[in-house]
Amino acid sequence: MKKILIFFLIIIVLIAFLSLILAITQKVSIGEKKVALIRIEGIILDSRKVIGELREYSKNSSVKAIILRVDSPGGGVAPAQEIYDEILKLREKKKIIVSMGSVAASGGYYISSPADKIVANPGTLTGSIGVIMELPNFEGLTVFF
């Protein structure tokens, strides 16, 4: 009786451990043809994580397409350009589909543009590729001197 209880405890621990591993990595290797999902959310300040995921999926022959879920108001110009360039390279090997969330503006819109297909909700705020640069205007102060 004690051996059966220990056996079932070991099985439960193994199942819990494997479930935890799958939940952390979000990768389930079932089947031959897969679609990968990469989330790009918030302000784009760093490209390393997204580029790392894109490169990882580009090497995986079982991944046939990549969905980019973009929900970003933009961010830094350099990281957006780096992600854009990586998507252009990857597009030669895999299908790229962009799904726009609430906002895909500025850099979010820019990184979406090289995709094979872009899907947006009717209420998605999108567009406006550009850079805003604010400078102080001291023109009125010079009158006093």
Which residue ranges define each predicted feature?
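Small-residue-centered hinge/linker elements
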Residues: 1-95, 102-145
